């Protein structure tokens, strides 16, 4: 005898609801944006009923505000803005999608979608560009204030390593050359001609580096 597989009991209000997009933006000067589509996804193994509610239902027309979604399917919900006036610019309205099992009345989950009417897409893009520019300038100013003093300190003169190498090269050139008999300097400090040429070459490079800074 096969045991019937029982579906786990779902807690009211805890079921995740998948809707795209989560924000609707209508532009007054672009009539093509006055109609937008919400897509409700059902990734579950059971059918869902849905219902669309709105905080300002007089401003919108919701096509198929209630219906059902088959398991692992999706449904498109068309929303039209029917009150495009300047007094509504910038006002944030909210849609709430509630879902439940077909055999139940209690709402298993809900999702809110915000809707905003703006005067123009171009103005919106301009505002976003200005915002990005201000953020970029702020970041640049912060970078300059944070790092410029350090850079100036570094570039104000030669490094200690450069000075040390220069002193070593000068000292090497002042040491006696191999073969000099009349010298008070110990023999192991006598340098060959090739060694002195290398020291002179390095000293020249160091001098050029110091002059460039």
Curated annotation (Swiss-Prot):
UniProt motif (Nuclear export signal) ranges: 205-208
Gene Ontology terms: biological process: cell differentiation; negative regulation of transcription by RNA polymerase II; positive regulation of transcription by RNA polymerase II
Membrane topology: Multi-pass membrane protein
Subcellular location: Endoplasmic reticulum membrane; Golgi apparatus membrane
Disulfide bond is among the record's keywords: no
UniProt-reported outcome of changing residue 63 to I: In a breast cancer sample; somatic mutation
MSP domain residues: 16-143
Role description: Plays a role in differentiation and/or proliferation of mesenchymal stem cells. Proposed to be involved in epithelial-to-mesenchymal transition (EMT). However, another study suggests that it is not required for EMT or stem cell self-renewal and acts during later stages of differentiation.
Name this protein carries in UniProt: Motile sperm domain-containing protein 1
């Amino acid at each position: 005898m096969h045991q019937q597989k029982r579906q786990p009991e779902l807690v009211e209000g805890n079921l995740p609801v998948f809707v795209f997009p989560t924000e609707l933006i209508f532009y007054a000067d672009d009539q093509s944006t006055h109609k937008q589509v919400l897509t409700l996804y059902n990734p579950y193994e059971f059918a869902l009923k849905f219902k669309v509610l709105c905080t300002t239902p007089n401003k919108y027309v919701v096509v198929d505000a209630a219906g059902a979604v088959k398991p692992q399917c999706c449904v498109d919900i068309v929303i039209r803005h029917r009150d495009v006036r300047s007094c509504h610019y910038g006002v944030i309205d909210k849609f709430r999608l509630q879902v439940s099992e077909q055999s139940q009345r209690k709402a298993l989950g809900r999702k809110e979608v915000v809707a905003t009417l703006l005067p123009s897409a171009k103005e919106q893009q301009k505002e976003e560009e200005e915002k990005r520019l201000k953020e970029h300038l702020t970041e640049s100013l912060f970078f300059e204030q944070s790092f410029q003093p350090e850079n100036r300190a570094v570039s104000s003169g030669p490094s200690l390593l450069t000075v040390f190498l220069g002193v070593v090269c000068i000292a090497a050139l002042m040491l006696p050359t191999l073969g000099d008999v009349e010298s008070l300097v110990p023999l192991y400090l006598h340098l060959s001609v090739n060694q002195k040429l290398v020291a002179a070459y390095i000293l020249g490079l160091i001098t050029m580096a110091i002059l460039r800074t």
